[in-house]
Amino acid sequence: EKIICGIQDLIGEKNRYREKMLTITPYAKTGMLHSMIAGNAAADNVGKFLDENYLDLIRPYFIVSVVNFAYDGTPAMREESHKREIEELFRTVTDIFSTDEVNIVYYFRDIYNVFLITNFETEQEMDDLFYQIHKYVSTAKSNSYVTMGVDIVRDDIGELKQACEGALKALDSILTEGRETVYFLEDTEDC
């Protein structure tokens, strides 16, 4: 809760949010965003973010999704190599699927879950993009079962925590529907 409040303080008012228009990409790629959300960032690092609005998104709309991996066998013995593979895969995913209109960043939670933030200018249907990402990741990681949970479109960075929770809630459909597909929060009954 403290971290989320800090993020909300970073962003400030919506008008100021739109005026500053800084990018989240360098911080997501270096793991700073993940560290803040997970509560692992040192106090002095968090202080740097309180200085200015470093976490503003480039465009007003965003969707958070989570990519979940289930492995055959136990990857723990090779956890470090899995981590490097997954991080390299998502660097490639962000390079391939980011365009002038859509910016995608990721943060690595662990070898089982990677969060993606898809940021875009106009509110639009993005389902096809998530299916394409799922197909690409599934093909690249053929030794695992890849499932995605996708939150709804949001336009307030103050809802970052809810967006992460929404993506995880969509992913809960694994329990009743199975793995190896994309689940959207808007399709769940009690969204």
Question: What are the residue ranges of the model-derived segments?
Answer:
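Conserved short hydrophobic interaction patches
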Residues: 96, 133-140, 170
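Short Trp-Ser/Thr-centered turn/loop motifs at beta-strand boundaries
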Residues: 150-152
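Catalytic core regions of nucleotide second-messenger enzymes
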Residues: 104-111, 135-148
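Interdomain helical linkers/hinges and coiled-coil/dimerization scaffolds
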Residues: 2-128, 154-159, 164-175, 180-191
